[in-house]
Each structure stands twice: as C-alpha cells, then as structure tokens.
Amino acid sequence: MEKIFASSLFGVLNIARVCLLAAGVLTASACQSESKMLSAPVTGYNHTSAAINRFSVNGAGGPNLGAYQGGGSQVCCGVVPRYWVPGLKAIVEWEKDPDPYSYGKWPERPYSDAWNKRMAREKQGYSRHKAIVEIPQYDSPGDLKVHFLPCDQVRVTAAGTSPGYPGYPYNYPMEMEEPEVC
C-alpha cells in the first residue's frame, strides 16, 4: 500500500513540476521585447518599356517584371525595421532587357541551336544596375515595394499601403515614357 501511495505521490509531484516549468517558460517568453525587424515580401512595379529580368533589394530577390507590369506577385522575404528611422536606405540591384519582345520576331525556331545562339548574343545587350536609395517615412511597415522608373531610376518604400491609396509615396503612372536624354 505504501508503494502505491509513494508512486502516485511521485507522479503527482512530477506533473506539478512540469506544470510549473511550463508556466515559467510561458511567463518568460511573454516578457520578451518585440522584434525590431520584420520579414516583408518583396514586390516590384516596372514603369518602363524594358523588362526587369531580375532584381534584389538589400539582397532579397524580387519577381521578374515585364514591360509596364508589376504588383501581381511577391517573393519572400526581405527585412524591414518595425519602426522607420531617419537615413533608412535600400540597395537595389537589377538586370534590364531593353527589348524584351525581340525574340518573337526572330525567324529561328524557338529553343533550336540557332535560336539559343541568338539569345546568347541578345543577353549581351542586357544592362546591370545598382542604386542606393532612401526609404521614405512610414507609419506601419508593409511589403518592400520597388518602382523601376525611366532613366534607370528606382524608388523603394516599405509603407503599409499600396499604390493608388492615400499616403502611398509613389503614385506614378504605370506607363511612363523614357525621355530621349536622361
């Protein structure tokens, strides 16, 4: 009888210890400060007639963008501060195809050896760019949104709003003309 009492008492004490440990862990995790950085999807808006074959913002890749396209897809994930700080900047790198629809006019059969050789020559005309730009103030963070503008200009925002809505910093027309001289 003493063995049964001792083993059931031991079981109750173990359960009590586990409950106290769990309560302590939950209490400690509830007291942690909020994170200073948040993950943010990356999306892009191409306001030019060129294609943006690939781009990255602060090392996080974004979707490829056809001429005058964007906002339709996101790639995960970049990182943004929970709260905007003065001097916040983004490094944007991208590859641009100035004539994205030229292959449609080629006489070569698509993906043939001749077509692949021509595509290799075409890719030599792609240009690569890098810009460091300021991220304007935002009240609540959102996606990292990159706007590609004529003359190889870019703008980046992490605002919690979208193009066309009040408070969005870059409401450019989707189709912008490239000036003759930049």
Which sequence ranges carry the predicted segments?
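Beta-strand-rich cores of mature extracytoplasmic or soluble domains
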Residues: 96-182
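Disulfide-rich extracellular modules and peptides
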Residues: 33, 78-79, 153
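Tryptophan-paired
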Residues: 55-101
